[in-house]
From Swiss-Prot:
Name the UniProt record assigns to this protein: Formamidopyrimidine-DNA glycosylase
Known cofactor(s): Zn(2+)
Quaternary context: Monomer.
Positions of disulphide bridges: none
InterPro entries: DNA_glyclase/AP_lyase_DNA-bd, DNA_glyclase_Znf_dom_DNA_BS, Formamido-pyr_DNA_Glyclase, FPG_cat, MutM-like_N-ter, Ribosomal_uS13-like_H2TH, Znf_DNA_glyclase/AP_lyase, Znf_FPG/IleRS
Cofactor: how bound: Binds 1 zinc ion per subunit.
Originating species: Haemophilus ducreyi (strain 35000HP / ATCC 700724)
Gene that encodes the chain: mutM
Family that this chain belongs to: Belongs to the FPG family.
Zn finger (FPG-type) start-end: 237-271
Keyword DNA repair set for record: yes
Catalytic activity: Hydrolysis of DNA containing ring-opened 7-methylguanine residues, releasing 2,6-diamino-4-hydroxy-5-(N-methyl)formamidopyrimidine; 2'-deoxyribonucleotide-(2'-deoxyribose 5'-phosphate)-2'-deoxyribonucleotide-DNA = a 3'-end 2'-deoxyribonucleotide-(2,3-dehydro-2,3-deoxyribose 5'-phosphate)-DNA + a 5'-end 5'-phospho-2'-deoxyribonucleoside-DNA + H(+)
Catalytic residues as annotated in Swiss-Prot or TrEMBL: 2 (schiff-base intermediate with dna), 3 (proton donor), 57 (proton donor), 261 (proton donor)
EC number of the protein: 3.2.2.23, 4.2.99.18
Ranges in coiled-coil conformation: none
Length: 274
């Protein structure tokens, strides 16, 4: 599943080509993905793209006629093409945003769990207003994390993956961050110390920043808009490495289902207090 670094990578890849352009048309081949594609998108011809941004895992295309919200879902990807070199759409190519300059932003999604939505203002859209702070923002502090964790009996891995607490810390990066902080994924969030919250906040930011620099993580479906894979998978410490030796201590990496998601950890580097 594309997570925050992958969406940020998409944003940085397509923004130089789309910002300031005028939409010629939006071709919708599949009327329903996770939700029905907003009918307003069919009336975007002639709208100027003012800017692009990201909120959590939503890519937002700001136009003079409202905002287009794109979510990649489980298997979605965006590719930049040029109409001067037409490429036939595959059965999984559901949406094309075409500019008057001939640039095509093509959305591919084999599992159709993504979304193309419209809002007058993205920041007021219900799916956006309930989100927690961005993990790379100044509002995501260790003090905030510590206060939010009080009286939370849920496992810390589920806690940091909760978008009401902080957005964008998906399964891969939660496992990696907890390893870097030396925190067992099953530790109850309320048992986090202030020192651990400082460490956890710092490593979440470090892990996500590094993943963005590496272009995200390619495990199966994700590719960058230019077709290249993300390279963060090459430096994963624990995720997907069950039975392999920990790069720090040599202990075998373990895996356990926590909150219906596979979680990876080193039992020695991340001991669970008794």
């Amino acid at each position: 599943m594309p997570e925050l670094p992958e969406v940020e990578t998409c944003l940085r890849g397509i923004e130089p080509y789309l910002a300031g352009q005028t939409i010629q048309q939006i071709v919708i081949r599949t009327p329903k993905l996770r939700w029905p594609i907003s009918a307003e998108l069919c009336a975007m011809s002639g709208a100027k793209i003012l800017a692009l941004s990201r909120r959590a895992k939503y890519l937002i295309i700001h136009t003079e006629r409202g905002d287009i919200l794109v979510h990649l879902g489980m298997s979605g990807s965006l590719t930049l093409l040029n109409s001067s070199q037409p490429t036939k759409a595959s059965k999984h190519d559901h949406v094309d945003l075409i500019t008057e300059a001939g640039i095509i932003l093509r959305y591919n999604d084999p599992r159709k769990f993504g979304a193309w939505l419209w809002a007058k203002q993205a920041e007021n859209y219900p799916l956006i207003t309930k989100l927690g702070p961005e993990p790379l923002s100044d509002t995501f502090t260790s003090d905030y994390l510590f206060k939010k964790s009080r009286n939370k009996t849920v496992a810390v891995k589920n806690f940091i993956m909760n978008n009401d607490i902080v957005v964008g810390v998906g399964n891969i990066y939660a496992s990696e961050s907890l390893f870097m902080a030396g925190v067992h994924p099953e530790l109850a969030a309320q048992n986090l110390t202030e020192k651990q919250c400082v460490q956890l906040r710092n490593v979440i930011q470090a892990v996500l920043t590094k993943a963005i620099i590496q272009g995200g993580t390619t495990l199966k479906d994700f590719t960058q808009p230019d077709g290249k894979p993300g390279y963060f998978a090459q430096v994963l410490q624990v995720y997907g490495r069950k039975g392999e030796e920990c790069r720090e201590c040599g202990t075998l990496i373990q895996a356990k289902v926590i909150g219906q998601r596979n979680s990876y950890f080193c039992p020695d580097c991340q001991p669970l207090p008794k």
